[in-house]
């Protein structure tokens, strides 16, 4: 007897395309159903939760996304106090790197774990790891303990990133997910922007340890909500444990982790700790390249047991979203990082004031993100919104590249609003595209791939922007203020410039900073423009409203992968 608090799914002939359940080897040979996957809806007797449960679960997951977003940026204003307390200036970069490296290294692995094991319990275990890491960071008496805690939190966040999106696919049909996904993305975006402000408040008023204590009660609320209100769907247990373990691709993971760690270390250290020609950076890139090629060969060899099954990357929309995501998110990262630097260095405001001046971007993202979600729920198609998001983001970045020292509030408010609208249109859509395009059994891996690309974009474009900024700043200082040593500029930071330089050279220094920052926005313009090509690769008819009959699961009645793609317009 169905629970009265639940909503019955549509009839069998109206199931979402995202609820397909058949997987195939290359060439069309059939694989066993992956019926252990929570998101793999088997028949029309399965029920989605009722409205109250959907709201509670979404709010719980959104709170967790807020915590994860905070952890990405909250230490920006707290690190000086931490290094002073621990007397550990040499460890400073590891407070951020330990978290980022572990998160990026394990995101794809969690995509496979979510494929074979309960979404609910995998998410709760990931949340437990994140909370444990936060607790260690909050109470640690040493710098080493803080680094270990950050690494453990990073491992947990690797499961929370894709888990949040996968949970939404468990609690709502595809055509209702745009609004839920937008809400999750907005909470994460707000946390990313407000993180440095909260970090400064905690550090000045309480203690830097509250940057981590704050995660404990919020994560606790999420854990209670998910545990009580999210049900593990009934599925047939016909996948042997040995096959599940084998399907986690241990060989591929063992090669992928050192490959991605080498790449990220090269991107983080290059131009900062060492110059790009340093033998350490060159060797890291070589190691990353060689291991990356080995990993690709392993994926081809393992086929369906690979971390990313090759057939998944043969789908136009998956490839398109990856090509779209890297430059699009890269542009958002560059603008999000260097707009506050422009406010603080050129306009001379404090960190908290720069956060307030950054609100037009936040408001634009929230408003347009919600409005576009409602529109997508009505029209279904997403490709036009991807293109429009890229265009608006590129225009906004281009307008910001015209900033001058004399630029007034009308300019920086209006230009940021354009950036926010572009980000609101395109940031979360790739996650919906892959959910609408791939079979349900592939949703966890496809989701993890997109989120991994988002993380990778941050590392790549942060390194590019940092190189552009530092080189342009040094060149501008040599031209505009030849009496000033460029090294002292680079080592001194971007704040309190009026206190560090005499009045006769200060205008030249401010102009040099303005030139350096606006040149980084050129990289944002190029990135946003490139993302348009990815949007056009995505199939135009991928829709959150499109209903197709499920493929037959009996031998002789199933379609080959190529036939299925042809039917769906791939």
Curated annotation (Swiss-Prot):
Location(s), subcellular: Cell membrane
InterPro entries: MFS (IPR011701), MFS_dom (IPR020846), MFS_trans_sf (IPR036259)
A Pfam family hit: MFS_1
Keyword annotations of the record: Cell membrane, Glycoprotein, Membrane, Transmembrane, Transmembrane helix, Transport
Biased composition (Polar residues): 1-11
Main location: membrane
Superkingdom as given in the UniProt entry: Eukaryota
Example of a GO cellular component annotation carried by this entry: plasma membrane
Regions of compositional bias (Basic and acidic residues) in chain numbering: 561-570
Signal sequence region: none
GO molecular function list: transmembrane transporter activity
Residues linked to a glycan: 541
CDD domains in alphabetical order: MFS_Azr1_MDR_like
Region Disordered, residue ranges: 1-34, 550-570
Membrane association type: Multi-pass membrane protein
Residue intervals passing through the bilayer: 50-70, 94-114, 121-141, 151-171, 182-202, 210-230, 247-267, 278-298, 323-343, 356-376, 379-399, 413-433, 445-465, 517-537
Function according to Swiss-Prot or TrEMBL: MFS-type transporter; part of the gene cluster that mediates the biosynthesis of the indole diterpenes penitrems. May be involved in the efflux of penitrems.
Matches recorded under PANTHER family: MAJOR FACILITATOR SUPERFAMILY, MFS EFFLUX TRANSPORTER INPD-RELATED
Annotated family: Belongs to the major facilitator superfamily. TCR/Tet family.
Name by which UniProt lists this protein: MFS-type transporter ptmT
Organism of this sequence: Penicillium ochrochloron
């Amino acid at each position: 007897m169905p629970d009265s608090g639940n909503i019955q799914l549509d009839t069998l002939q109206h199931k979402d395309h995202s609820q397909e359940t058949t997987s195939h080897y290359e060439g069309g040979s059939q694989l066993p159903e992956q019926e252990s996957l929570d998101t793999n809806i088997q028949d029309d007797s399965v029920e989605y939760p009722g409205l109250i449960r959907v709201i509670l679960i979404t709010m719980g997951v959104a709170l967790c996304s807020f915590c994860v977003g905070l952890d990405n940026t909250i230490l920006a204003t707290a690190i000086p106090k931490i290094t002073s307390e621990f007397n550990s200036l040499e460890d400073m970069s590891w407070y951020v790197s330990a978290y980022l490296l572990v998160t990026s290294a394990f995101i794809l692995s969690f995509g496979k774990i979510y494929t074979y094991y309960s979404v609910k319990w995998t998410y709760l275990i990931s949340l437990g790891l994140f909370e444990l890491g936060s607790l260690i960071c909050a109470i640690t008496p040493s710098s080493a303990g803080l680094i270990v805690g950050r690494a453990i939190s990073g491992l947990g966040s690797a499961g929370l990133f894709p888990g949040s999106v996968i949970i939404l696919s468990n609690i709502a049909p595809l055509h209702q997910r745009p609004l839920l996904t937008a809400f999750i993305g907005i909470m994460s975006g707000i946390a990313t922007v407000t993180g440095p402000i909260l970090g400064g408040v905690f550090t000045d008023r309480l203690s830097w340890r509250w940057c981590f204590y704050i995660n404990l009660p919020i994560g606790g609320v999420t854990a209670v909500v998910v545990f009580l209100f999210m049900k593990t769907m009934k599925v047939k247990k016909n996948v042997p444990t040995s096959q599940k373990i084998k399907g986690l691709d241990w060989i591929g993971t063992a090669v992928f982790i050192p490959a991605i760690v080498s790449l990220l270390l090269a991107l983080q250290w290059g131009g900062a700790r060492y110059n790009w020609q340093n033998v350490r950076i060159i060797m890291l890139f070589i190691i990353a390249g060689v291991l990356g090629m080995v990993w690709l060969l392993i994926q081809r060899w393992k086929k369906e047991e690979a971390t990313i099954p090759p057939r998944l990357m043969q789908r136009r929309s998956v490839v398109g979203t990856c090509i779209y995501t890297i430059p699009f998110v890269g542009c958002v990262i560059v603008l999000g990082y260097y707009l506050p630097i422009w406010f603080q260095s050129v306009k001379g405001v404090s960190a908290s004031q720069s956060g307030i001046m950054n609100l037009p971007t936040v408001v634009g993202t929230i408003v347009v993100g919600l409005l576009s979600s409602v529109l997508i729920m009505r029209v279904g198609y997403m490709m036009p919104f991807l293109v429009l998001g890229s265009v608006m983001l590129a225009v906004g970045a281009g307008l910001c590249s015209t900033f001058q020292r004399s630029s007034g509030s009308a300019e920086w408010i209006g230009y940021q609003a354009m950036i926010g609208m572009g980000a609101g249109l395109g940031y979360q859509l790739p996650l919906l595209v892959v959910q609408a395009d791939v079979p349900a059994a592939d949703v966890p891996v496809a989701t993890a791939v997109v989120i991994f690309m988002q993380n990778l974009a941050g590392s790549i474009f942060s390194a590019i922007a940092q190189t552009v900024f530092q080189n342009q700043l040094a060149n501008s200082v040599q031209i505009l203020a030849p009496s000033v040593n460029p090294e002292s500029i680079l080592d001194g930071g971007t704040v309190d410039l009026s206190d560090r330089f005499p009045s006769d050279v200060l205008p030249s220094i401010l102009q040099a900073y303005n030139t350096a920052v606006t040149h980084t926005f050129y990289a944002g313009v190029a990135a946003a423009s490139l993302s348009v090509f990815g949007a056009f690769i995505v199939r135009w008819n991928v829709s959150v409203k499109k209903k197709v009959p499920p493929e037959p699961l009996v031998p002789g009645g199933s379609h080959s992968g190529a036939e299925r793609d042809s039917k769906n317009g791939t």
